[in-house]
């Protein structure tokens, strides 16, 4: 009896795994086409449009695609300093480096908040929570392009697989180019060019180091936590931290 239970349990688990593999093969996105074709939309953009409709608001999408050569090196450095300092050397996953960098950021931000008399040093998530959510640029792009915000084992597994193939199929420059053109920089603002025009009335190619660090500072959550209108001190503190790291990051 016990042997039969073990047998059927094993077959059941095997069936689930095989079913998941078949589903992945059928629904897996075509990563290779991103080498030469810019994505027309992303899962995140579509989710934001649906959210606006559900609220009864007019959906907004302001986005202008520009090649990486027309995005300021300052912004490239700032984004890597803020989001993924080892982007050029890792293969999609770099949790240890992110943890070390964020621990240092926590210490510096808390110190500066105290000096400014702002008792909001807890604006940076506690390390255990942050570590679970930390992502490299490649991981962020995988989620942004193809996945929902659902938190589940299968979604994280799919994110890991897509990240692996993004790194295998695309160059680092192409990954960074797509990332900088699709990420959200405010309500309905997508991509570096739209963000530059919205915040500074200039092209993304003309951004100064300080302006670039400002845009990088709001990436984690431009609508609430790092909204420059609602939380200017938080944005300014993160901006300063990013500016300190910009000279040391390597761009692809």
Protein language model features and the residues they cover:
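Juxtamembrane regions of bacterial inner-membrane/periplasmic proteins
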Residues: 2-252
